[in-house]
Amino acid sequence: MLINDTIFFVKNHEVEAPKATVILTHGIAEHSGRYEKLVDALNAASYRVVRYDLRGHGQTEGPKGKLKSYKQPIEDLHQLVQIVKSEFNLPVYLFGHSMGGLIVDMYGVTYHDVDGIISSAAASHYVKDVVPFKVIGYKWLSFVKLKTNFADHKLSSIREVEERYIEDPLNLKYYYISLAGGMMLGGVRYLNKHLKSFKTPIYILHGGKDEIVPKAFSQRFYELIDVLDKDIKFYNQSLHEILNDIEQEQVRADIVAWLDKRVKK
């Protein structure tokens, strides 16, 4: 699908008589194909799902692991939302995990045209790995490559999940500071500057044992946004990828329940 002059990998998962459309946004260095179980759970509950690979990731065209501006993912998602809304007269919900959680949170302070947002382990504040670049200035180091090291017993307590992550050819082995700094510094700064603009119903989820993005980030975000319809839940036995850890079935059930409650209003 052509979005902002780039061919994006976009896959629609259709159902009969859908209640709503859920658009999935994945995290840094991964791809949308890792969310099959969530797609299946949403389809089973009569939600059509649209998943896509972010710019610089997966099967989307263009240089991998790079980003010109933190604004690009927001505008890419916005155009996708407009396409989805033009094709189906249905409520639209956004789901995002980790950097994808940051992206949907940023979307929420920029646009107000979706019916709800589900934000999982969002990097909504400055993670420790990028703090040095905040001091130095990431734009001066945008050409530097960083090795992906998330699968270091930090993604999930299920070993097979980390093994599959490492073996997956669509996951990035390296990414550039232009991507990490652009999103985790520039994007985070933008989000926190505009928190008062966030008005969309939101469900915030986080692993209680997350060592990549501290759960305190989600608690902080929850407390700072002035939204009437907001919920938060921690999964105390899970690491960063709550959808791939030991509480994953409960997470999927909670997401469906949250959506059902709002779609039926």
Model-found features: residue ranges?
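Gly/Ala-rich beta-loop-alpha elbow adjacent to hydrolase catalytic centers
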Residues: 96-100, 104
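N-terminal cap/lid segment of alpha/beta-hydrolase-fold proteins
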Residues: 1-15
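Short beta-strand/loop motif that positions the catalytic acidic residue
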Residues: 198, 204-206, 210
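Short alpha-helix in the alpha/beta-hydrolase fold that links the catalytic acid
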Residues: 214-223
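Catalytic active-site module of serine/aspartate enzymes centered on a nucleophile-bearing elbow/loop
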Residues: 231-265
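Conserved alpha/beta-hydrolase
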Residues: 34, 39-62
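Catalytic nucleophile-loop/oxyanion-hole region of alpha/beta-hydrolase
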Residues: 29-31, 58-84, 88
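Flexible "cap/lid" loop of the alpha/beta hydrolase fold
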Residues: 109-144
